[in-house]
């Protein structure tokens, strides 16, 4: 079998990029050649090169939510982007395309279909998005993180970075990067790659009550476009966390949105969580977290109800009761699917092998 040449399409937010790169890393370890497809508008412009992968750019084609001039331009923009994507697939001599939803995925699926290149559609959320549903309808192989997403396909879980587990130096890095004490209980707060203003507001309101416990410290990723309270002893605000392995290594409790990638990484790390689902979209964030709540690994709080009092009281309840905490840790670890990236890499290699045989 020739060396597989794979294009991974996942851009915009970390929720689309991270699973794509987790699969890309697994493929690279096996000797495959991988190129990432993205746009100039997303986080991939920094994250992908930092991970050592080549990034090819196409024009983003967002779907307007209102009837306006942009809506009438949509077909022409989409055709132009599909043409760009087809050129990239041809130049790279692509064997397989795998998409993870978002603006980049739909042009990738359509271009792969037109080029007669096998393609895979991975849905990370509990409720599938439009681009991925389109991909499966076009003949792509559907892979789901969970059952009953609304998209046909095999359940494989969510691919996560191998560096998030088994990193013996991660705890030391957490101490060096943020001055955190590994002997204290650490709350990791994050609103995802974009931050979350409502969570930030609750932190500002409740941080003093949380820090009243001298055994608790807080690492707060508030988002590059947002602001946070001033740093103080045992409270470390940062705009963005580049080294999530270090953050997870020292964290005892995670508070944040319940995007599919966040939920997958938390459970793989075996960390109890308080999830505050994004109140917009099609409700997929609440659905992402619901199985963890039912299994006892997490608590779910509506965005409108998460304030300073909820922040401080829930954190104290979980971290202050060792039996409750231990039960949540066990439930989180049992819910994880840490081998999804390897499973998907196996599928890609099988497709390439069969495709070579049928040429």
Swiss-Prot record:
It is found in: Cell membrane. Gene3D superfamilies: Glycogen Phosphorylase B. GO terms for biological process: carbohydrate metabolic process; cell division; cell wall organization; lipid glycosylation; peptidoglycan biosynthetic process; regulation of cell shape. One of its GO terms (molecular function) is undecaprenyldiphospho-muramoylpentapeptide beta-N-acetylglucosaminyltransferase activity. CDD domains: GT28_MurG (cd03785). It comes from the Bacteria. One of its GO terms (cellular component) is plasma membrane. Its EC number is 2.4.1.227. Keywords: Cell cycle, Cell division, Cell membrane, Cell shape, Cell wall biogenesis/degradation, Glycosyltransferase, Membrane, Peptidoglycan synthesis, Transferase. Pathway: Cell wall biogenesis; peptidoglycan biosynthesis. Belongs to the glycosyltransferase 28 family. MurG subfamily. InterPro entries: GlcNAc_MurG, Glyco_trans_28_C, GlycoTrans_28_N. This is UDP-N-acetylglucosamine--N-acetylmuramyl-(pentapeptide) pyrophosphoryl-undecaprenol N-acetylglucosamine transferase. Its main location: membrane. It holds the Pfam family Glyco_tran_28_C. It is a peripheral membrane protein. It catalyses: di-trans,octa-cis-undecaprenyl diphospho-N-acetyl-alpha-D-muramoyl-L-alanyl-D-glutamyl-meso-2,6-diaminopimeloyl-D-alanyl-D-alanine + UDP-N-acetyl-alpha-D-glucosamine = di-trans,octa-cis-undecaprenyl diphospho-[N-acetyl-alpha-D-glucosaminyl-(1->4)]-N-acetyl-alpha-D-muramoyl-L-alanyl-D-glutamyl-meso-2,6-diaminopimeloyl-D-alanyl-D-alanine + UDP + H(+). Cell wall formation. Catalyzes the transfer of a GlcNAc subunit on undecaprenyl-pyrophosphoryl-MurNAc-pentapeptide (lipid intermediate I) to form undecaprenyl-pyrophosphoryl-MurNAc-(pentapeptide)GlcNAc (lipid intermediate II). UDP-N-acetyl-alpha-D-glucosamine binds at residues 13-15, 125, 161, 193, 241, 285. It comes from Corynebacterium diphtheriae (strain ATCC 700971 / NCTC 13129 / Biotype gravis).
